[in-house]
A protein has these predicted regions:
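Flexible loop residues that form catalytic
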Residues: 83, 159, 222-225, 239
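The AdoMet/dcAdoMet-binding core of the Class I SAM-like
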Residues: 2-5, 27, 52-191, 197-207, ...
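A short, compositionally biased
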Residues: 38-42
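A general beta-strand register signal
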Residues: 45-46
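Glycine-rich, charged/polar anion/phosphate-binding loops
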Residues: 17-20, 30, 138, 218-222
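SAM/dcSAM-binding transferase cores
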Residues: 1-36, 208, 227-269
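Conserved S-adenosyl-L-methionine
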Residues: 192, 214-225
Length: 269
């Protein structure tokens, strides 16, 4: 069966051959679907927008997790905003001493990911070093600030922050200020910033906002078949630009050559 999925909120989309519909339902917050689509393999779809695919899973999550962490002198505690599929958490839990706090408001996304994406998240939800919270991310961060909890990295693995998206508030100037106050000295904030060809202004807007709070703002990216384009990440830090560093954990896709490629891919896009 051929179905059309959006790549963003602007109506841009692709037609895929859906081999299997594993689950499709409405949660309190959004529509959720997990299907198998030909070459893409399993996909997670929220509000008819593809969030991840089995095909690009390793390159997306390994790049997102390990490029920032490789540039830290120490990494003891990290925060994931969103990330309800559990795959970014899986990558970060490879670091044996790291505690991961994950905040995803939609509990049902996590429940379905436990059931249908187990082969991708490798049961990360059961790891004792993962603290899972289902609440507003900003409320969680405000309470963490009161408790004086500090993070080495904060990852915004949220739905694409388009102008009409609920995620837009999670990358507002006030939100970035809040995240900055939760970072340890030399900590880093990293966010996915969408398809650079379909939504070129997103990268610019996020970098501008990050620049209000961090001495250094940079980006890196991957080529994703799911998007048929270059997918971007933006980071903010007071410790200089990300450099190529050895990766201290086992990865399937990310290696030295690809690390360097990811750091330079957005220069010509």
């Amino acid at each position: 069966m051929f179905v059309t999925y959006s790549l963003d909120n602007n109506g841009v989309g692709h037609v895929f051959n859906r081999e299997t519909l594993h689950v499709q339902e409405e949660s309190k917050y959004q529509s959720i679907e997990i299907s198998t689509l030909g070459i893409l393999g399993k996909v997670l779809v929220l509000n008819n927008i593809i969030q991840l695919s089995e095909h690009d899973c390793e390159r997306y999550h390994e790049t997102f997790a390990h490029i920032p962490v490789s540039n830290l002198t120490t990494c003891e505690r990290v925060l994931i905003l969103g990330g309800g599929d559990g795959i970014l958490a899986k990558e970060l839990l490879k670091y044996k001493n790291v505690i991961v706090d994950m905040v995803d408001i939609d509990e049902r996304v996590c429940e379905l990911s436990k059931m249908y994406l187990l082969d991708l998240n490798e049961n990360s939800f059961e790891n004792k070093r993962l603290n899972l919270h289902h609440r507003c991310a900003l409320d969680f961060c405000k309470k963490a600030l009161v408790k004086n909890i500090k993070y080495d990295v904060i990852f915004a693995d949220i739905t694409d922050p388009h102008p009409n998206s609920p995620s837009k508030s999670l990358l507002s100037d006030s939100a970035i200020s809040l995240y900055k106050s939760l970072l340890r000295k030399n900590g880093m904030l990293v966010s996915q910033t969408d398809n650079v060809h379909i939504a070129p202004n997103h990268v610019h807007d996020v970098k501008k906002t990050f620049g209000n709070h961090f001495e250094t703002v940079g980006d890196f990216g991957i080529v994703a078949i799911t998007l048929s384009s270059v997918f971007s990440f933006v980071y903010g830090s007071d410790s200089g630009m990300i450099q190529h560093r050895p990766i201290q954990v086992k990865t399937k896709w990310l290696n030295k050559t690809r690390f360097e490629f990811c750091l330079n891919i957005l220069e010509n896009n």
